[in-house]
Amino acid sequence: MYVGRFVVVAPGIGAYRVSSRSFPNRRVTDRDGRLTVGPTPDAPETDNPYVSYNCARAVRTPTDEPLAVVGNGSHVDPIAEKLELGYPARDALATPLLALDFEKDDYDTPRIAGVVGAETATIGVVRRDGLVVEAVDEPTIVATYETDSPEPYALAAADAETPDAAAAATEVLGADFEHPVCAAGATVDADGATLAFDNDAE
């Protein structure tokens, strides 16, 4: 099944995967602590505005609470910025998702995102037909296609004694959905947020 890009979040852990039929020549890179999806050097040139973006960021709130943001587009940055200003996770997700709306491409691709705290998680999606933002207490997935409403997801990395961001990225990259490209993972505990990525989709 092809679900496109997807986010999985739970308290303390999150992940994001790029699945793509149109632009498979992409990788995640670490740019000054922000994980960025972008084209590989051999990728064909494109003017598509949705191909490159920050997909994961670690932030601190004004009360020094560590959080991580994952998502499939340019909305990740304003979500992170609102969290840094002290917005609750619900509002930090809802405001940029509503303002930027679904992607204006041929498929009306939804924007998806999640905010992960050490003991909390919130997931959001804006589609042509609606906006959903909800707090979750177990691993939950939302995708751009097919699974475009939040639903429970079996994420083994969330059950580890010590959750690992790299393990989360690798697990979702290997998930049984078509056209995997690359993935990012995030973990959050009292000491801070950790980001990792996996580009080995073979």
UniProtKB/Swiss-Prot annotation:
Organism: Halorubrum lacusprofundi (strain ATCC 49239 / DSM 5036 / JCM 8891 / ACAM 34)
Name of the protein in its database record: IMP cyclohydrolase
Pfam families xrefs: IMP_cyclohyd
InterPro entries assigned: IMP_cyclohydrolase (IPR010191), IMP_cyclohydrolase-like (IPR020600), IMP_cyclohydrolase-like_sf (IPR036795)
Protein role: Catalyzes the cyclization of 5-formylamidoimidazole-4-carboxamide ribonucleotide to IMP.
Pathway annotation: Purine metabolism; IMP biosynthesis via de novo pathway; IMP from 5-formamido-1-(5-phospho-D-ribosyl)imidazole-4-carboxamide: step 1/1
Enzyme class: hydrolase
UniProt keyword annotation of Hydrolase present: yes
Molecular function as annotated in GO: IMP cyclohydrolase activity
Reaction(s) the record says it catalyses: IMP + H2O = 5-formamido-1-(5-phospho-D-ribosyl)imidazole-4-carboxamide
NCBIfam families per UniProt: PRK04151.1, purO_arch
GN (gene name): purO
Family: Belongs to the archaeal IMP cyclohydrolase family.
EC numbers, comma separated: 3.5.4.10
Coiled-coil region list: none
Region named Disordered: 27-48
GO biological process, one term: 'de novo' IMP biosynthetic process
Keywords, comma-separated and alphabetical: Hydrolase, Purine biosynthesis
